[in-house]
Amino acid sequence: GANDFMRF
């Protein structure tokens, strides 16, 4: 989603 960059 829009916050996939938060998936570590």
From Swiss-Prot:
Tagged with keyword Secreted: yes
Main localization, broad class: secreted
Keywords (A to Z) from UniProt: Amidation, Neuropeptide, Secreted
Gene Ontology CC: extracellular region
Highest rank taxon of the organism: Eukaryota
Keyword Transit peptide set for record: no
Location in or out of the cell: Secreted
Protein family according to the UniProt entry: Belongs to the FARP (FMRFamide related peptide) family.
GO biological process: neuropeptide signaling pathway
Listed name of the protein: CalliFMRFamide-8
Modification Phenylalanine amide occurs at: F8
Organism annotation: Calliphora vomitoria (Blue bottle fly)
